Amino acid sequence: HPFGLGYLGYYMSHGSFQTGLYSVRWVHNELLQMLLDIGWIPTVIAIVAVVKAVVAKQPAVRKVVLLTLLAHCMMDFDLEYIAMYFILLVCLDWDTGKTKTVKLTVPAKAVAAVLILGSLYIGVGSTLYYSGKVEASVKVYPWNTQARMELLTQAETAEEMDEQADAILALNDHIALAWDAKAEAAFGRGDFGAVIDDKNNALANTKYIKGEYVDYFNKLAVGYQLYMQAGDTKSAQICLDEIIGIQDRIDRVLASTDELAWKITDKPYLVMPDEYNDFVEAHK
């Protein structure tokens, strides 16, 4: 996307394409972080400004500070801190170039006012969230995914879970927590068709979490038994096919796992419990 995935967008989405058991909140490289967060268009503009500052005729000490900061940015996300931005701004080329006076026309003032009010609006929502007033922050700024996720974990009824999960998925459909919540709500009302759809979406975004597969099996096993008791063999067979397919899904995940995933401390472990294997053997 030309304007990136947004703040924490990569962290929220990486479960859908990861090839090992890991969790990455920051990539520890400011250039890559900018590309992920704000996209390639703003990043290119930033690179042009920095390169211009490096080649410009300005004090050597300013260039040394700038190059040192840039070198460290390749190993950490320094620009997450406002103070680092201030240092970067001081080191940019402010001494050369043409001076141009811009008159503030009515349209320009209107745009400035909208930007200021928008920043204040988002800032109020963020301040409420970081001060622990999650519900109030969502009322002010309902597009805060993290706040929505906190409210989801606090939901007490299936209706509340569904409502918060839908709001989260409207913002980012790669969040497994929301799909799990919808599956749990569907399980509570006995809608196993929805359970299958929602758990498959959850598994697509949490490929290396064994508990997800076990939870799916447990829900399907209950569905299978209930359908058999009701004489609905067609629906029971759908549940059974999904149960048997769990191991096939695991095999596909392991086949696509990167070789490096087996060399780190947290290695993939997706061995289903004996209860699963016994169930499959008994119903072949």
Where are these regions (language model features)?
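Hydrophobic transmembrane alpha-helices and their immediate junctions
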Residues: 40-67, 211, 217
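Structural signature of transmembrane alpha-helix termini at the membrane-water interface
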Residues: 48-58, 71-78, 94, 124-127, ...
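Transmembrane alpha-helices of multi-pass inner-membrane enzymes
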Residues: 58-112
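TM-adjacent membrane-interface loops and short helices in multi-pass inner/ER membrane proteins
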Residues: 1-24, 31, 38-44
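Alpha-helical transmembrane signal-anchor/signal-peptide segments
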Residues: 128-143
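C-terminal luminal/periplasmic domains and tails of membrane-associated envelope-modifying transferases
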Residues: 141-284
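Membrane-interface micro-motifs in multi-pass membrane enzymes
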Residues: 26-30, 34-41, 75-88
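Internal/C-terminal transmembrane anchor helices
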Residues: 104-129
